[in-house]
């Protein structure tokens, strides 16, 4: 079949293509404006404003898609456009993208709009971008009018200290640094502590991405050091340390440390990128093994990440032969979970009905997942990719899985030829369920898992999240050993919960009763009761009481709730606190403290 017509003769085709691209350009302009505004909010230490901006940006893409669909339907009666015109629309669109700075994202926007207009039977044909049509290699912006993707610095000329200061000051952050010279010396000392001294090769240079990465209460400088054949990735988090004063907080220069800050369990960065593919290529060079789909998602282009993930899934299915199976572990009452062993993700469907004592609805569960998508996940809640109409080959589905799907979620299934189409599914990174990790672990594993579990719940509390069902099976252990929450159907805002202490029993009958002798409201939580299902294993109990003895004290939970109600936001560090310069090199901060004390005395 000849996929390219001899003549592009449709004026409507060209006009629709222009309208589609204008819709994308509006979206990306708003996307970049959000990143620029993030810098202003960071400089002003407006943390609530940054949170609001991040939430609004997540919903912005779908709003722009709806706007574009409405315009196409109103002006061109898009649903009734002939097939040959649709083919020309795509080809005109490709022509318009030849000099575009974000062609891959524009292709995804095209798909998002067209898949709402066209029937699913068109999803894999020539009318949409099943594969990229425009290469993203070697795309550059218009310098010097625009910032380069990254800047190169040469420490061999002026010395490492001067170069590092120049790197930081080139970002032109408005609040001054408390003591940038001190911070730079901390960076140099951390480099020596990690790697010792090294001879400078002729190509010794530092590459730094031109835009800051904003998330939570931090801005990250991201770069790489090149010396001979060595390539060293690094991130420098910038924090407010006092009102109106900044400081470099740490040096992250190990691959695992960078992978954690770009993890699927963190919220998306706000970062200004004229050429996103160039940023993704740079990040890919320092995050070896991280899929492009996850990198696009981590920098806020989650729809592009979602598109690439689906292409990765289809390619994996072509080059594998194992079958989808029911996920190992304890089955949930709300979600049916299955996985493809050779593919590191799980697929989650909402069941059609939930057995007692679950009292929820499909709509409420969907709402909980949307809450998590919009909320700051702090590295403790897994991101989810939400898909509609996912077609999987029946030959790749285990018989037991098909029976389970037909039993638990028949309304979500549709058979089309050799495929089973799932109407709605969530996809998450596969982790080791914490209960299995604890069950099979050594004493050291158990201590690590319990310490991480307690830290995870406490950090979620600080972020105004009450997990609801806190059984170990609802948490997973990542490949970096982090404990992450992933079961959202009972999640609530902590500020909506009524923290209560268990009233003392009124008599011996109360004390011996297996049922509560006190009233329990729908939003009441009783931290003292959690020990009954968390401390059954003696080894778990020992580690839990060693690291988190306060976990079962209602005062801890109430304190966090009060803290949030006062509008305060805590500091979060997606790296070990021992890496913070103020903790790692206290002697370098002692002089500042003496000077400050002298000034106060004067």
UniProtKB/Swiss-Prot annotation:
Active site: 383
Family label: Belongs to the AceK family.
Protein name stated in the entry: Isocitrate dehydrogenase kinase/phosphatase
One example of a Gene Ontology biological process annotation: tricarboxylic acid cycle
Substrates-to-products reaction catalysed: L-seryl-[isocitrate dehydrogenase] + ATP = O-phospho-L-seryl-[isocitrate dehydrogenase] + ADP + H(+)
Role description: Bifunctional enzyme which can phosphorylate or dephosphorylate isocitrate dehydrogenase (IDH) on a specific serine residue. This is a regulatory mechanism which enables bacteria to bypass the Krebs cycle via the glyoxylate shunt in response to the source of carbon. When bacteria are grown on glucose, IDH is fully active and unphosphorylated, but when grown on acetate or ethanol, the activity of IDH declines drastically concomitant with its phosphorylation.
Superkingdom of origin: Bacteria
Gene name of the encoded protein: aceK
Disulfide bridge map: none
Keywords: ATP-binding, Cytoplasm, Glyoxylate bypass, Hydrolase, Kinase, Nucleotide-binding, Protein phosphatase, Serine/threonine-protein kinase, Transferase, Tricarboxylic acid cycle
Organism, as annotated: Paraburkholderia phymatum (strain DSM 17167 / CIP 108236 / LMG 21445 / STM815)
Listed EC numbers: 2.7.11.5, 3.1.3.-
